[in-house]
Amino acid sequence: MGDARGGDAHGGPGGPSGPNGPNGPNGDGPGGDGDGPDGDGPNGDRSGIGICCSGGGIRSAAFALGGLQSLDAAGVLRRADHLAAVSGGSYTASAYAITSRYSDPEALEGQRPFAPGSPEEAWVRNHCSYLTNSARDTLRLVGVAAIGLLANLVFFTALLWTVARPLGWLYAWWQPDLRVSGECTAGASPETAWGNGCYAPVGLTGLGPWLLAAGGLALGGLLLALGVRMFQPGWPLRQTLRRVALVLVAVGAAVAFFAWALPELIVFTRNVLGGEPETGPVTESTGVGSSSDKGGANLGFIATVGGAATLAALVVQVGGTLRRAAVTGGRVVARATTRLERLSGGLRRVANTLVGAVIGPLALAAGALFILNGGAQGAHPRTGELLLWAVMALLTGAMLWFADVTAWSLHPLYKWRLSRTFAVARVVGEDGGVTAAPVPYERLLHMSDLTPEQFPGHRPGAPVFPELLVCASANVSDQGTTPPGRSSVSFVFGPRRIGYPRAVDVPRKVPWWRWLLYPAQTEQDTVRFGPLEGPTRDYERVVGERRRRDITISAAVAMSGAAVAPSMGKMTRAPLRFLLALTNVRLGVWLPNPANVPQSSSVPVNPRQIRLLYEVVGRNRVRSTFLYVTDGGHIENLGLLELLRRRCRTVVCLDAAGGSTTSFSTLGEAISLAASELDVRVDIDPAEALRSLDDGRRINDGDTVEGTITYPDGTTGRLIYGKALVTPRSPWDVRAYAAKDGRFPATPTGDQAFSGETFDAYQALGRHVGRACAERVTGAATGNPSAAASPSAAADVVLRAETQATA
């Protein structure tokens, strides 16, 4: 099996022994150090400490802020080799990196970046409701979403006009009875309309040969498939005959659809939606015609219903946010909304499935049928009609060829909102005072500028800040590239390398006819393609100035937090793809494939509009010019996998991924993935050490636990796991807030509009958990300002606070 990049399967760049293979110097197997010069494992000369911060939106960002503050105070952060972060965790991790790298050096004297009480900490806290911090922000968000939706509707409308209108003209030429007489005008009396033949029945002619051909093709395919099943010819002839049978049935169905079903649908449309003489013939002489005008209105009604259903689905999706808003209006409204939400769980699922899988495509099909019907009404296209079609065709071509499919998605706005909150530096003002200010958005903060040696104050053996790894995922749909249900690979933005460090198996490229006629050979003939990564600085150079803005630090963080998109790795919901793509609910980004960087001097300027159609159908090919990159949580939501890939000896994991406070599925998924992909074993049991006290008040027995890491070569390490849990030893103010807020410490990720009080509670909890993790790393207590409390005392605190809240 050869290497798609020109190397041998065992000795090429992507092979096991090649430089990028698992056993090569840059690989992730036992023979490599995980990231070439960045390695920190047994072959590296650094501390071997890695820190990872989980995803979870602003909840995780606040928790990670407190955790990193404690780790920094204990000296663990600056000693670490890698800081891996996902989604919300990357908000804070990138903020730490940007402040450390781009602040005025004199402003940092005497106080570490993001130390408690620092100006940048206050900045982030004051802007923690980063998406909609004001009515102006909300209006802008709605406006951007509306413009994106309009752009999508314009594209689909132009595409339908370009394809369906000429097909209608063809039907008018082939079936004269579909034409509408010029004497059938709007407002004509019934007698005149009858006399002019406006309601004459349609006689579809010449269908016999076409239907005979369609039936013959389909019957031949079925008989061939039956013969293959009964007589079992040898392999691979069996697969070829099955494919031929499938092709015959498909061609027969297509002939029947275009020759008979589609003309009948046109007539059916006129019958059902009709009512005016200017629409021409129908199937029965009932005096009821079909109206292009009324038909358009009815089809518009269908589209309106689809839009209303879409809105309903989105409303029930954000029901939690609406409930929280209702709380501020009164306890009665809040309780009523809560009961409504309890009843809407099933309706939510039905609405999502109905809108995504039925109404959206049906509305689009209805629009296509309306355009097709209009083209079938005239003997010849009118001049205005031809001009309109030409405009639509030019618009479709221009959008397909020149438009940037990322430009009108929600990603640019999301990236900007994150940047203005978390891309902050400490500066010396004109008055000599120290303050925090956002880094100008137009300034490109390159990932390649974050290598540890580039940080101010760095000295050999005395690092200032670890290497930042922003963890996202690249969606892939090639069969056999990933296990079923995963549909993505890790995609990491690092200062030295970007992408996925492994090669993958993909079918060899063959001519279409060979793929069609010889499926057995083509499916088994695979090649190694990759690795899907490249040097970050080379990647930034090759992608060009326009695309370079898509791989800045803020862009990487936005992609790491791109939680909603048509393709979402293991979280993909196929029925929702159409809905999300059509309504422009797209946070993912099409990035140039890093695997192509060594062979390219440049890449296409834009990911073209055709990729919106790829999003609709979930087409994400590994060999594509662009990869669709989304939330890191779509493959692994802790960042733990990337630290194990780099063979860290001591790993601190800060988990605020949310979910239940009594289960640890996020950690379990990460450990399972590390075992299957890296052959790294982790022995840990958080369920026992962090068990719930089962008093109904969200109190757990602990918040940190330690496990053992075993690498393939037998080298061992430590996993120190800290989770956002309230325990009897948590600070009293955290326990009091938990009594007040029934969702704490697992506020739903859909709530990104934190108040300062909620942000402070998660930060304080993170600071407490981070301190406990730091003590395990250093082996010495660093002090705990909160007095330990017994489980019963903690329960009493919660009970008293809840009693006061409901009094």
Regions of interest found by a model, annotated:
Residues D3, D8-D45, S790:
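Asp/Glu-rich intrinsically disordered low-complexity tracts
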Residues G44-A807:
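Patatin-like phospholipase A catalytic core
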Residues M1-G2, V315:
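Accessory "access/gating" subregions that flank catalytic or transport cores
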